A protein has these predicted regions:
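A contiguous, surface-oriented mixed alpha/beta subdomain in the mid-to-C-terminal portion of proteins
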Residues: 2-125, 130, 135
Length: 135
């Protein structure tokens, strides 16, 4: 949904399983060897806390087909989110995380929900770095 210049990811081998997407393309998801900076994770945590529609956030490497893996931040929604709402949230996230990542690398910001394969796969394989606490 959004790509922002970001922290370096040097992991070229993913440790988790591959899945076939609906088009037959292999999708590889894994834990980064070098996690994103704590400043970046804290920024995403704080922004996620402010949004009632985000229930969890995940940092993972993802590769599609034969492409090299890239760092992704997945924001998990309990239900399929409204596109306008996601676009506004991602603009806000982009403005806030851009200063925390270098100019030569990038971070993919992705919406995750129970209705898409990526959301199901990430939730099954990656531990969230943020989880909404309901009181």
């Amino acid at each position: 949904m959004g790509r922002y210049s970001g922290d370096p990811v040097r992991n070229h081998a993913l440790r988790h399983s591959a899945r076939n997407g609906s088009s037959g393309t292999r999708l590889y998801i894994g834990t980064p060897d070098e996690p994103p900076s704590e400043a970046l994770l804290n920024c995403v945590r704080e922004l996620s806390r402010r949004s009632l529609v985000i229930s969890a956030a995940y940092a993972f490497n993802m590769a599609v087909g034969d492409n090299l893996p890239s760092l992704s931040i997945g924001l998990y929604f309990d239900t399929k989110p409204n596109l306008r709402e996601v676009e506004e949230l991602f603009r806000q996230f982009g403005r806030n995380i851009r200063p925390l990542i270098s100019d030569i690398n990038f971070v993919d910001l992705l919406p995750l929900d129970p209705s898409n394969l990526l959301g199901v796969a990430v939730r099954a394989q990656i531990k969230p770095f943020y989880r909404r606490v309901v009181q």
